[in-house]
């Protein structure tokens, strides 16, 4: 939402989406300078379409999560119904020959459904999460239907080249589509542009807020309240089993047990934003994480000074930016992630040019932020060693790394991302 809002405002576009509420409103709302067209989703559809097929089937499959996906026909039927409802709403409000940008794995059937309703439209689709290799995608009983749904678009965008290649492989294998030159895929008389468009953030806004007096004062206050430790390690994630929070916490605990980190000098702050709280897998993940936090704090905390400060809450940007600035070492270690904008937000917030980013090699951000300390989060020893290296890194190494990442971000903003995609779409 934060990444897309400036683009919709700048293009004077309309937003079609779900409010996030069961049996929510359907009245048009004008807010933040744009028209919002809600698509109502019933309580049963939330269970089947959203929590069921989208997040119980597609999410773990696309992230290659080590857990079984659900393959239920009633949930697939609900997925089809909701995608059809979105397509109808878009078809009803889109001006002639408008550009329509569909987002994410929840709406993979919309491009072709919309094409059947409004062939005059220029349709783009962007995937915010990984797209899996063929050997994983083939497990899905409705694999061909999803590929056909996506091939209704004019432009298909993925976070990484790897995701785009995986899609092309699936389209060739499952529907006999043909890969042409210049990123085109030919299918049933049409050419579809397939490419990598790595998403970014509003770098200027982050830098402006991070440079402000309020952010500086709040950063100092955070450090003081944490006991002015020598090093603050920071994790900011949605509470999701793909984010590797448990592995990260265990690595920190092991380093304390081994004496490689000192609880009087090194503290950790872990923010876990609530998400999908009605899904059992996420409830289990929360319990496991909170148990790990309790065990480590029980072993290593002093009275009034926990070694891990754990927040299960969503923080506003005005609180998050000072927290980023306070973090000396940022730990972004998901098992797999389409991009991970937290890594970019941390870099943008460090207007002082200091700080160390520890980054999973299985994120899209790793393609762009090569000066981070890249790590395989599945390798416990490598993760521990990388954390220690980050903590001990001298400023003469820290600052050039951070400066290089900051310069790259400044030439790859959210506006650059949106414009690169929309330019291709509008030129079709």
Task: Tell where the protein language model's regions lie, with residue ranges.
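Catalytic cores of carbohydrate-active enzymes across secretory and cytosolic contexts
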Residues: 1-428
